[in-house]
Amino acid sequence: MISISVKESGDKKFLNQVMEVIKENYKNSYFEVSDFCEAVGVSKSLMNKKLQSLIGQSAGQFIRNYRLNIARELILKNRETKNMNIAEVAYEVGFNDPKYFTRCFTKQFNVTPSGLMNHEE
């Protein structure tokens, strides 16, 4: 019982650190898995192993999905005002290629970013 709670608290601490690092760095388009691992203080293999077991994603998938979820929130907030276009949203969340962003977004959410912005979901 004690080892389980220690493991759970260790996993929780790890995930809290992971979230803190991603929140601080996701806008940086040069922030990639190696930087992520270095900031958390673990090897790439350990990062991937732990994230896969805890949330079912590799480090690369986690970074991309985090960025896409933030982008989705930005698009939903910008529906009425249209203060940002899709390319600006892509750059804001750390993608440096709007076309790649659109492909990833569409695959993740089954709607294009512009479709979501224009209420076509």
Per-segment meaning from a language model:
Residues 1-16, 53-61, 65:
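Short, Lys/Arg-enriched, Trp-marked, Pro/Gly-tolerant hinge/linker segments that flank
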Residues 1, 118-119:
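Generic structural signal for short, solvent-exposed loop/turn connectors between secondary structure elements
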Residues 53-96, 119-121:
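Terminal helix-turn-helix DNA-binding modules in bacterial transcription factors
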Residues 19-31, 51, 55, 73-84, ...:
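Basic, amphipathic alpha-helical hairpins
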Residues 10, 27-28, 39, 63, ...:
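Helix-turn-helix/winged-helix DNA-binding modules
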Residues 33-62, 90-112:
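Basic/polar phosphate-binding segments, predominantly the helix-turn-helix DNA-binding elements
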Residues 1-7, 14-46:
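General nucleic-acid-binding
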